Amino acid sequence: MGKSDKIIPIAENKEAKAKYDILETYEAGIVLKGSEVKSLREKGTVSFKDSFVRIENGEAWLYNLYIAPYKHATIENHDPLRKRKLLLHKREIMRLYGKVQEKGYTIIPLKLYWKNNKVKVLIALAKGKKLYDRRRELKEKAMKRELEREFKGKIHL
């Protein structure tokens, strides 16, 4: 990875890993207004709460991604929750559309980051976890943590 491929994270959807099984990920460009880019550069607030991707008329759109309004903008400020177009290859859009038609699949944003001075979104094809799956996962994590704690001081090399 060269110096020009530097990736600088902006925000991450931490809730997604807990609520969904991630099957495939895609990197997409995003169409933003000037005030949105300035807000992101100033470390403006970004929230993935209830955000999702929908495919309409062969185009991918990101809904409910909150980007805080730019403080120094005038009347030309953006709507913080507007839908934003995602830039993907046509075959990627068609593949995602085909998968989403199957029951239980959805497309969610995972991460927002800078790459080569452009804002990118990492989106994922995901399947929602059932409540009992999440509970089982939490129990397994707790047991693993307990075992590590128990053996921490006992193993000497």
Curated annotation (Swiss-Prot):
GO terms for cellular component: cytosol. It holds the Pfam family SmpB. SUPFAM superfamilies: Small protein B (SmpB). It comes from the Bacteria. InterPro entries: SmpB, SsrA-bd_prot, SsrA-bd_prot_CS. GO terms for biological process: trans-translation. GO terms for molecular function: RNA binding. The keyword Signal does not apply. Keywords: Cytoplasm, RNA-binding. The keyword Transit peptide does not apply. It is found in: Cytoplasm. Belongs to the SmpB family. Although the Valle et al., electron microscopy paper indicates this protein came from T.thermophilus its sequence maps to A.aeolicus. HAMAP family: SmpB. PANTHER family: SSRA-BINDING PROTEIN (PTHR30308:SF2), TMRNA-BINDING COMPONENT OF TRANS-TRANSLATION TAGGING COMPLEX (PTHR30308). Required for rescue of stalled ribosomes mediated by trans-translation. Binds to transfer-messenger RNA (tmRNA), required for stable association of tmRNA with ribosomes. tmRNA and SmpB together mimic tRNA shape, replacing the anticodon stem-loop with SmpB. tmRNA is encoded by the ssrA gene; the 2 termini fold to resemble tRNA(Ala) and it encodes a 'tag peptide', a short internal open reading frame. During trans-translation Ala-aminoacylated tmRNA acts like a tRNA, entering the A-site of stalled ribosomes, displacing the stalled mRNA. This is SsrA-binding protein. It comes from Aquifex aeolicus (strain VF5). The lineage of its organism: Bacteria, Pseudomonadati, Aquificota, Aquificia, Aquificales. The gene is smpB.
